[in-house]
Curated annotation (Swiss-Prot):
The chain crosses the membrane at residues 91-113, 124-145, 164-183, 197-215, 228-253, 288-314. This is Potassium voltage-gated channel subfamily KQT member 2. Residues 264-276 dip into the membrane without crossing it. One of its GO terms (cellular component) is axon initial segment. Changing R353G: Increased suppression of current in the presence of Ca(2+). Each subunit contains six transmembrane segments (S1-S6) with S1-S4 forming one voltage sensing domain (VSD) and S5-S6 contributing to form one quarter of an interlocking pore-forming domain (PD). The S4-S5 linker preferentially interacts with PIP2 in the open-state KCNQ2 channel, whereas the S2-S3 loop interacts with PIP2 in the closed state. Phosphatidylinositol-4,5-bisphosphate (PIP2) potentiates the activation of KCNQ channels by enhancing the electro-mechanical coupling of the voltage-sensing domain (VSD) and the pore-forming domain (PD). In the closed state of the channel, PIP2 is anchored at the S2-S3 loop; upon channel activation, PIP2 interacts with the S4-S5 linker and is involved in channel gating. Calcium suppresses KCNQ2 and KCNQ2-KCNQ3 channel currents, with calcium-bound calmodulin inducing a change in channel configuration which leads to the reduction of channel affinity for PIP2 and subsequent current suppression. The gene is Kcnq2. It catalyses: K(+)(in) = K(+)(out); Rb(+)(in) = Rb(+)(out); Cs(+)(in) = Cs(+)(out); Na(+)(in) = Na(+)(out).
Length: 852
């Protein structure tokens, strides 16, 4: 039987059984589960496929020998030698100092060998040093070639050839060949050959170049020259022009009189030695013309010839300072990396986050509980016992987080030791195999291969190293919910192990589903403290290196501030708008000015809104003027009302006269006799004129407002109430001009007969507020404004109008599709229109009759 792992693979059985290939269930062609949907499509043909890591058998089983340690030692030695030769640090400089002294000694002896007095004494020592140098350099060269294999790009024979083609390796092989040639020629005793090959000894000067294996000095020089290349080219170019011009003019002046300037080449030599401030004195001008020209060009040319030295010096100084600053900045890498790591763990160990598991898995693998191994008397095996000072802690862990402790016999005793969580996980019933069912003496403990090897070597030591498979199994064991599911599952054994069922009689396992809350809180506290410490260390590493560093930080901050201000200014310009100023020259001189394009800025939009509000205000003024004209309100009183902005009046006061008028209103009702003429027009009988003393007219609109009461829509504080037309001005006396008929109408209007009933006044809204107008009424007219009054109120008003002007046509309602402005009265401009008949004192107010 085999056990399927989480990834769908299987562990191979014993050597006696059929070996199963590790793979995914349902993906192998011809497998029992290959009939699943999509399995054949994924598997493809049965041709041999490329092997993967899952297909490789597990190495280092119980029957296998020790893993070869030569590979690890081989790689370690390669890395060590490569670092010593190519990247020396610390005590590795001792070897390079020894090589430098050896090369320098050979160079000094080569110099002394050219002197006749020291030739014989220096040749013997030089011969010995040459042999030592050749041996050292030869061995070092081959070691370099071999150690370069630690780098991935230099592995294999092609990689070695690539490493051998490096410039410094080429110099090494050239010096080695030259040294061997010189040594071979000197050992033959041939005088001619020795004198001819003696010059090859100076090839040993190239050995000094190899002292700088990494080429730091050459890189520094190249970076300085490249950084100041423009300045150097300018100085050299102008200096070269001065050299040519000065040499040519001095040559022309000294050609016939001075033998030192016979050719132009002599003049160039003189100019170069003079402008470079060397001045050998072998050539000099003798005529006064030549001396004057030489002095003039010397003052100009020397300054340009000296410029490259200053440029290179300052460049070297700046570059070295920059390198020191860069090294100082590199010291911030470790604190920054530690801060990032601690910040992530501080974030990931938040107890409220339930979606982050990797950090907790790290602590699950690293947390250990010390245990004591003691030998049992029954089976002669050892079991894990916690120390006395940790019994209470383990009891609490067991009670809080479901930790399970069970006894298990161990195959061999061991002294007191600190057992890691991995050992306790693998000393589980999953690792217990018995030859006979129910026989505890035959039980064995399954361990990892590394543990078996270490126990064979030294039984008293605890196995510390465990393979990747053991770690994966440990992570799986951490998440096992209970023992029942583990006992029912099938077991898988490594090669060389017996496959048996679990022994349920004697089990011992330390299994935890998750860390305890208390342990999590402790880990959280440690992460917080580490984060604070890392933050403090990183802040300490951010201290400025020098004054230039401070200035650089301030300049960088200033540039950042300027960029932010520029961005803010652009956004402000986009919002406010910054249009180009239009001058008189740019204006088009024409009869009609062209419309300017709309400004997309916020200020342009606000201006457009203001224009629309102004247009709406004009329309409202126009509608209010129509209302005042229709209701007969004088403009002076309306302006006084809106200008004063008086508060709402008190509740209406009912005077005794109003009560008496209310009591006598039924006696003053005038019966209106309607008759129809042959043309179909209505004729109204005029009521008798009542004396004005019986019903005194009102003198102000406040009294009229008090008499009418409150509006049906309510007196809300946010509504602007338009005053009702006064009783003595409803006939529009401003248009009639004080006629006698208007005076009679005012008298008639003051009578109770002409006064509308209280119910009509209550139902109608004579005191009209603008928000009380219904939307349906607004849609009836083209002007968007209409006034609704009850039919009874309009009939009563019509009777009063008929008393004075019987021929006037009264239109109490407005037909659909017709607006208030359709009548001649509502014309906003021009003189007041006449009536249809043009007669009567109220012709100005009467509406025109229907058109025939």
């Amino acid at each position: 039987m085999v056990q399927k792992s989480r990834n769908g693979g299987v562990y191979p059985g014993t050597s006696g059984e059929k070996k199963l290939k590790v793979g995914f269930v349902g993906l192998d062609p011809g497998a029992p589960d290959s009939t699943r949907d999509g399995a054949l499509l994924i598997a493809g043909s049965e041709a041999p496929k490329r092997g993967s890591v899952l297909s490789k058998p597990r190495t280092g089983g119980a029957g296998a020998g020790k893993p070869p340690k030569r590979n690890a030692f081989y790689r370690k030695l390669q890395n060590f030698l490569y670092n010593v030769l190519e990247r020396p640090r610390g005590w590795a400089f001792i070897y390079h100092a020894y090589v430098f002294l050896l090369v320098f000694s050979c160079l000094v002896l080569s110099v002394f060998s050219t002197i006749k007095e020291y030739e014989k004494s220096s040749e013997g020592a030089l011969y010995i040093l040459e042999i030592v140098t050749i041996v050292v350099f030869g061995v070092e060269y081959f070691v370099r070639i071999w150690a370069a294999g630690c780098c991935c790009r230099y592995r294999g024979w092609r990689g070695r050839l690539k490493f051998a083609r490096k410039p410094f390796c080429v110099i090494d092989i050239m010096v080695l060949i030259a040294s061997i040639a010189v040594l071979a020629a000197g050992s033959q005793g041939n005088v001619f050959a020795t004198s001819a090959l003696r010059s090859l000894r100076f090839l040993q000067i190239l050995r000094m170049i190899r002292m700088d294996r990494r080429g730091g000095t050459w890189k520094l020089l190249g970076s300085v020259v490249y950084a100041h290349s423009k300045e150097l080219v300018t100085a050299w170019y102008i200096g070269f022009l001065c050299l040519i011009l000065a040499s040519f003019l001095v040559y022309l002046a000294e050609k016939g009189e001075n033998d030192h300037f016979d050719t132009y080449a002599d003049a160039l030599w003189w100019g170069l030695i003079t402008l470079t401030t060397i001045g050998y004195g072998d050539k000099y001008p003798q005529t006064w013309n030549g001396r004057l020209l030489a002095a003039t060009f010397t003052l100009i040319g020397v300054s340009f010839f000296a410029l490259p030295a200053g440029i290179l010096g300052s460049g070297f100084a700046l570059k070295v300072q920059e390198q020191h600053r860069q090294k100082h900045f590199e010291k911030r890498r470790n604190p920054a990396a530690g801060l990032i790591q601690s910040a992530w763990r501080f974030y990931a160990t938040n107890l409220s986050r339930t979606d982050l598991h990797s950090t907790w898995q790290y602590y699950e693998r690293t947390v250990t509980v010390p245990m004591i191994s003691s030998q049992t008397q029954t089976y002669g095996a050892s079991r894990l016992i916690p120390p006395l000072n940790q019994l209470e802690m383990l009891r609490n862990l067991k009670s809080k987080s479901g930790l399970t402790f069970r006894k298990e016999p161990q195959p061999e005793p061991s002294p007191s030791q600190k057992v890691s969580l991995k050992d306790r996980v693998f000393s589980s019933p999953r690792g217990v195999a018995a030859k006979g069912k129910g026989s505890p003496q035959a039980q064995t403990v399954r361990r990892s291969p590394s543990a078996d090897q270490s126990l064979d070597d030294s039984p008293s030591k605890v196995p510390k190293s465990w393979s990747f498979g053991d770690r994966s199994r440990a992570r799986q064991a951490f998440r096992i919910k209970g023992a029942a599911s583990r006992q029912n599952s099938e077991e898988a054994s490594l090669p060389g192990e017996d496959i048996v069922e679990d022994n349920k009689s004697c089990n011992c396992e330390f299994v935890t589903e998750d860390l305890t809350p208390g342990l999590k809180v402790s880990i959280r506290a440690v992460c917080v403290m580490r984060f604070l410490v890392s933050k403090r260390k990183f802040k300490e590493s951010l201290r400025p290196y020098d004054v230039m560093d401070v200035i650089e930080q301030y300049s960088a901050g200033h540039l950042d501030m300027l960029s932010r201000i520029k961005s803010l200014q652009s956004r402000v310009d986009q919002i406010v708008g910054r249009g180009p100023t239009i001058t008189d020259k740019d204006r088009t001189k024409g009869p009609a000015e062209t419309e300017l394009p709309e400004d997309p800025s916020m200020m342009g939009r606000l201006g457009k809104v203001e224009k629309q509000v102004l247009s709406m205000e004009k329309k409202l003024d126009f509608l209010v003027s129509i209302y005042t004209q229709r209701m007969g309100i004088p403009p002076a009183e309306t302006e006084a009302y809106f200008g004063a902005k008086e508060p709402e009046p008190a509740p209406p006061y009912h005077s005794p006269e109003d009560s008496r008028d209310h009591a006598d209103k039924h006696g003053c009702i005038i019966k209106i006799v309607r008759s129809t003429s042959s043309t179909g027009q209505r004729k109204y009988a005029a009521p008798p004129v009542m004396p004005p003393a019986e019903c005194p007219p009102s003198t102000s609109w406040q009294q009229s407002h008090q008499r009418h009461g409150t509006s049906p829509v309510g007196d809300h504080g946010s509504l602007v109430r338009i005053p009702p037309p006064p009783a003595h001005e409803r006939s529009l006396s401003a248009y009639s001009g004080g006629n006698r008929a208007s005076t009679e109408f005012l008298r008639l209007e003051g009578t109770p007969a002409c006064r509308p009933s209280e119910a009509a006044l209550r139902d109608s809204d004579t005191s009209i507020s603008i928000p009380s107008v219904d939307h349906e009424e607004l849609e009836r007219s083209f002007s968007g404004f209409s006034i609704s009054q009850s039919k009874e109120n309009l009939n009563a008003l019509a009777s009063c109008y008929a008393a004075v002007a019987p021929c006037a046509k009264v239109r109490p309602y407005i037909a659909e599709g017709e607006s208030d402005t359709d009548s001649d009265l509502c014309t906003p401009c021009g003189p007041p229109p006449r009536s249809a008949t043009g007669e009567g004192p109220f012709g100005d107010v009467a509406w025109a009759g229907p058109r025939k």
